[in-house]
Swiss-Prot record:
PANTHER family: ATP-DEPENDENT CLP PROTEASE PROTEOLYTIC SUBUNIT (PTHR10381), CHLOROPLASTIC ATP-DEPENDENT CLP PROTEASE PROTEOLYTIC SUBUNIT 1 (PTHR10381:SF15). Cleaves peptides in various proteins in a process that requires ATP hydrolysis. Has a chymotrypsin-like activity. Plays a major role in the degradation of misfolded proteins. The active site is at S101 (nucleophile), H126. One of its GO terms (biological process) is protein quality control for misfolded or incompletely synthesized proteins. It catalyses: Hydrolysis of proteins to small peptides in the presence of ATP and magnesium. alpha-casein is the usual test substrate. In the absence of ATP, only oligopeptides shorter than five residues are hydrolyzed (such as succinyl-Leu-Tyr-|-NHMec, and Leu-Tyr-Leu-|-Tyr-Trp, in which cleavage of the -Tyr-|-Leu- and -Tyr-|-Trp bonds also occurs). It is found in: Plastid, Chloroplast stroma. GO terms for molecular function: ATP-dependent peptidase activity; ATPase binding; serine-type endopeptidase activity. This is ATP-dependent Clp protease proteolytic subunit. CDD domains: S14_ClpP_2. It holds the Pfam family CLP_protease. Its EC number is 3.4.21.92. Belongs to the peptidase S14 family.
Length: 204
């Protein structure tokens, strides 16, 4: 039997009685957002909508986007990235577990100096791919041209936001490049790596 989303009590300001809301609803009220699945149109629209709403609600408080994603569709990922640059609050990105493919693209899109990885997180970058075998010859050519444009877009963003030269990013995107948290920091994808407290096991 699947476990449902846990519910937690929440009291609106000025109200005496608390109401029960699901835990993600509660976290969203604290401006904490989660990308914990493949990137597709549904989750992209949810995150974009939340960022826009929370920006309208209060454009002075930062947003925090936690990422544990194997990647996914390019265009929905770009939609999240563009919205992060559009909203007025700074968006912190936090990698926990894995930020691969479009997950790493969204990770690097956080406010520079406010991108963090947990100590055992993994990051992977590569070029966009497509299922060419499903396409007819004409569609194959058109799709290949579109992929080249998307690759150019992603490469430019990585260059801009990591500080690496174009040739370094271009070489990295030729294959799957996995990195530890510290390697991702050295590569400019994140700015900080959380430090584990040796006494308590908690991260600080």
């Amino acid at each position: 039997m699947p476990i449902g989303v846990p519910k937690v009590p929440f009291r609106n300001p000025g109200e005496e009685d608390a109401v029960w809301v699901d835990v993600y609803n509660r976290l969203h009220r604290e401006r904490l957002l989660f990308l914990g699945q493949e990137v597709d149109s549904e989750i992209s629209n949810q995150i974009v909508g939340l960022m826009v709403y929370l920006s309208i609600e209060d454009d002075t408080r930062d947003l925090y986007l936690f990422i544990n994603s194997p990647g996914g569709w390019v265009i929905p990922g770009i939609a999240i990235y563009d919205t992060m640059q559009f909203v007025l609050p700074d968006v912190h990105t936090i990698c926990m577990g894995l930020a691969a493919s479009m997950g790493s693209f969204i990770l690097v899109g956080g406010e520079i100096t406010k991108r963090l990885a947990f100590p055992h997180a993994r990051v992977m970058i590569h070029q966009p791919a497509s299922s060419f075998y499903e396409a007819q010859a004409r569609d194959f050519i058109l799709e290949a041209e579109e992929l080249l444009k998307l690759r150019e877009t992603l490469t430019k963003v990585y260059v801009q936001r990591t500080g690496n030269p174009l040739w370094v990013i271009s070489e990295d995107m030729e294959r799957d490049v996995f990195m530890s948290a510290t390697e991702a920091q050295a590569h400019g994808i994140v700015d900080l790596v959380a430090i584990e407290n040796e006494n308590t096991g908690n991260s600080i």
